[in-house]
Curated annotation (Swiss-Prot):
Family according to the record: Belongs to the YIF1 family.
Name of this chain's protein: Protein transport protein yif1
Subunit details: Component of the yip1-yif1 complex, composed of at least yif1, yip1 and yos1. The complex interacts with the ER to Golgi SNAREs bos1 and sec22.
Source species: Schizosaccharomyces pombe (strain 972 / ATCC 24843) (Fission yeast)
Cytoplasmic topology ranges: 1-139, 197-201, 248-271
Superkingdom to which the source organism belongs: Eukaryota
Major subcellular site: endoplasmic reticulum
Listed Pfam families: YIF1
Lumenal side: 161-175, 223-226, 293
Membrane topology field: Multi-pass membrane protein
Length: 293
């Protein structure tokens, strides 16, 4: 029979302070055993000198932003609204190809009248069809892409001639924007003096002023042949094609004959003046294209 074991008993009293138990739970980070200090959420208002003053400042800033948005919407919303811009960028691949061929070979086109979008309820005209549904409708996609391609192509040709500089991008782009702006303002002034007004006229004029870059791209590409007579021939042909294209395309705006025109009824004297103005727009393309080439 094994002997009985006796455990030693403490012979002195244990202080109460050493028997204190920490009842607060502190989470550990992973398996390292280190405690993660508790972080209290910061109060943003504690850092502000006066919360009432800050709220007043925020409210004034919000009111100023809302007033600015309302002013822009009232004065420029009718030209630069999202709905109108979406109309000019509603294109398809087949439309882009057909439109480029129309700009280069406008002589083959027979009908230049724009299609009207009819209401499904009473059949009344609600506006013009988007470019994807009407080849004669102006768009913003081709002018913007042609503008960008024209700038890049000129810089690339300068690089082939060891004459490229980084500043050339800005110079070419600024020059092209200035020419387009001058043409747009001159055309807009002529429309104002002749009392020519139609819906979405501003965006239409901007779109038509950018189609000339298609001919300028072909003119720049012809320089790769290093034969001056080829470049002159391409430039002259593209000028005639662009002028004829604008002459037929702008007719619906300058000489309104549809129900979408605001002032469709004009006298014979006004009509003759508008025809001269239309030919002036077409003839002036040779000057703008020469400056940009």
């Amino acid at each position: 029979m094994p002997p009985k074991l006796y455990h030693p008993q403490p012979t002195h009293a244990i202080p109460v302070s050493n028997m204190r138990v920490n009842t607060r739970y502190e989470p550990t980070a992973g398996f390292s055993g280190t405690s993660v200090p508790s972080v209290q959420a910061a109060n943003p208002s504690a850092y502000l000198p006066n919360s009432a003053t800050a709220q007043m400042g925020f409210q004034l800033g919000k009111n100023a932003v809302n007033a600015g948005q309302e002013y822009v919407e009232q004065n420029f919303g009718k030209w630069l609204s999202t709905t109108r811009l979406h109309h000019y960028f509603t294109v398809t691949n087949s439309y882009v190809v057909a439109k480029l061929l129309l700009i280069i070979f406008p002589w083959r086109r027979r009908s230049w009248a724009r299609k009207l979008r009819r209401s499904e309820i009473n059949g009344s005209a609600e506006g013009y069809c988007p470019p994807a549904e009407d080849l004669n409708s102006p768009d913003m996609y081709i002018p913007l892409m042609a503008f960008t391609t024209h700038i890049l192509l000129l810089c690339a040709l300068a690089g082939l001639q060891d004459d490229f500089q980084p500043e050339l991008f800005g110079l070419r782009a600024s020059k092209a924007c200035a020419v387009v702006l001058v043409e747009f303002l001159a055309t807009r002034l002529g429309c104002y003096l002749l009392n020519i007004s139609s819906q979405s006229q501003v965006l239409d004029l901007l779109a038509f002023s950018g189609y000339k870059f298609v001919g300028l791209i072909l003119t720049s590409l012809s320089k790769l042949f290093e034969m001056p007579w080829v470049t002159r021939f391409v430039f002259l042909y593209m000028y005639l094609a662009t002028a004829f294209f604008l002459l037929r395309s702008l007719k619906y705006a300058v000489l309104p004959e549809s129900t979408m025109a605001i002032n469709a009824t004009i006298t014979s004297h006004q009509r003759s003046r508008r025809i001269y103005f239309l030919f002036f727009i077409a003839a002036s393309q040779i000057l703008f294209m020469y400056v940009l080439s």
